[in-house]
């Protein structure tokens, strides 16, 4: 969990130039005086991680408590919260160890610290991959519930949802382990970038299609009640704003991290790219912010879940 300059060691393999990628012959520190580096204090990392940790623990506990929330949809939401919880937990653990090592309050051999760092890297990477997968799974689940409403309960059954969840976790752990082991291969980084783009396109296509169907439905209702066109336009505008916020937050929080991976492959030692690499901590902080925002978008909008959350907070088990 060593820190190189201002860069934390978490997923530190991403901060170094992969040896398998051709070099461009430029020094990595040739970023120029114009380069802007956003410093993220360890205290801020710790605070963001703790907020996300508590928030997602509450989501998992709430869904576990109420049997009415044990449907496939809430299973996916629970697993998303668990993934975000692991991302935050890994961040909190690493930041705490870094602070203890720097303060001299924790003494450990370099080999032990390296092994601990590798474990945290695998946990964090696998939880990030699973988080993206569950965001996609939630989009697919909602799409089926709208376009195949009559067959939804026969298509999305609890056993199928559990098998899908198990497959996502196994694949996430497997691929994250391979990624950490072979991070110095450009193909591995490109696979991660392609995976992110695939999830982004999947979510965009499904949610845009759902918005179009909702607008058609609202237009049909307006015609039945002989209402004017502005009602439909207002509904469509509201839906478009909601969709923009949902996809915008996803892209803004995850996009910079995968841009970082892309630039490692395309221009590992170009001054402009090197400047972007210096903000790796900021990109990680944005992902943790996404872990804080996810429950607000996918979980706490449910009235049943909010009611159960109040019971959890008042310890009325």
Swiss-Prot record:
Positions in the Extracellular compartment = 1-37, 94-118, 184-191, 267-279
The domain of life is Eukaryota
Question: Where can this protein be found?
Answer: Cell membrane
Q: Cytoplasmic side: which ranges?
A: 64-72, 141-163, 212-240, 301-317
| PROSITE patterns from the UniProt entry | G_PROTEIN_RECEP_F1_1 (PS00237), G_PROTEIN_RECEP_F1_2 (PS50262)
The glycosylation sites annotated in the UniProt record are 29
Q: Where is the lipid attached (S-palmitoyl cysteine)?
A: 315
State the family named in the UniProt similarity comment for this chain: Belongs to the G-protein coupled receptor 1 family.
Give the multimer and partner information. Answer: Interacts with MGRN1, but does not undergo MGRN1-mediated ubiquitination; this interaction competes with GNAS-binding and thus inhibits agonist-induced cAMP production. Interacts with OPN3; the interaction results in a decrease in MC1R-mediated cAMP signaling and ultimately a decrease in melanin production in melanocytes.
* Task performed by this protein: Receptor for MSH (alpha, beta and gamma) and ACTH. The activity of this receptor is mediated by G proteins which activate adenylate cyclase. Mediates melanogenesis, the production of eumelanin (black/brown) and phaeomelanin (red/yellow), via regulation of cAMP signaling in melanocytes.
List the protein's name: Melanocyte-stimulating hormone receptor
List the source organism.
Pongo pygmaeus (Bornean orangutan)
